[in-house]
Design a protein with these regions (language model features):
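The canonical Cys-X-X-Cys-His
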Residues: 59-63, 107
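Short active-site neighborhood of thiol/selenol oxidoreductases, capturing the structured segment around
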Residues: 45-58
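A short glycine-leucine-enriched loop at secondary-structure breakpoints
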Residues: 97-101
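Juxtamembrane extracytosolic/periplasmic "stalk" immediately C-terminal to the first targeting helix
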Residues: 35-44
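N-terminal targeting signals for export/organelle localization
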Residues: 1-34
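Non-catalytic, surface beta->alpha helical segment in thiol-disulfide oxidoreductase systems
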Residues: 103, 108-161
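Thiol-based oxidoreductase modules, predominantly thioredoxin-like and allied folds used
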Residues: 54, 77-93
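Typically the conserved alpha-helix immediately C-terminal to a functionally engaged Cys/Sec
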Residues: 40, 63-76
Length: 161
């Protein structure tokens, strides 16, 4: 590599980092709707079903599922709430542990009475390869899903999951 090629490599690398940073900023999940157990309890006892997406701002799958949650929220508008909880926070970890959701992305589905009726959790830390387990309120597997879709989230709220 000649002396002239080194600056070109550095510039190309710098541009790649800028583009990658821009993509990450555009796709990252952003702020949580739930920041405490009290926030979750208020939503759970609000008389409507609630879907809680547990995510991490550094989880690439969470970033790609962001639109999935938005589409489910649009479909369920007026009948259920779709909210987000950042798992790697103090409140997120406590809530995740209480409901057996330790990896992102995971989803908790509460009915209109505030009871956990379904949860969707990765089979392990690599859900892209292994998919997700759909669990009932007691933690028993009721089905599996290869990926999270708006239709899956909507069906879980409507009781078809």
């Amino acid at each position: 590599m000649g002396a002239a090629a080194l600056p070109a490599v550095v510039v190309t690398f710098a541009l790649d980092l800028v583009v990658l940073g821009g993509v990450w900023l555009a796709l990252r999940p952003g702020r949580a709707d739930i920041r405490s157990k009290d926030d979750l309890d208020r939503l759970r006892h609000g008389g409507r079903p609630v879907v809680v997406e547990l995510y991490s701002n550094f989880c690439l799958i969470c970033m790609s599922n962001r639109q999935t949650s938005k589409l489910a929220a649009m479909t369920l508008r007026g009948t259920a709430k779709v909210v987000r909880l950042e798992l790697p926070t103090k409140a997120g970890s406590a809530i995740g542990d209480a409901y057996g959701a330790r990896y992102t992305p995971s989803y908790l589905v509460f009915d209109e009475h505030g009871d956990l009726v379904r949860s969707v959790v990765p089979d392990n830390v690599t859900p892209l390869a292994n998919g997700y387990r759909v669990l009932d309120g007691q933690g028993a597997i009721v089905s599996r899903a290869q990926r999270i879709t708006p239709a899956l989230l909507v069906s879980l709220v409507r009781g078809a999951g």
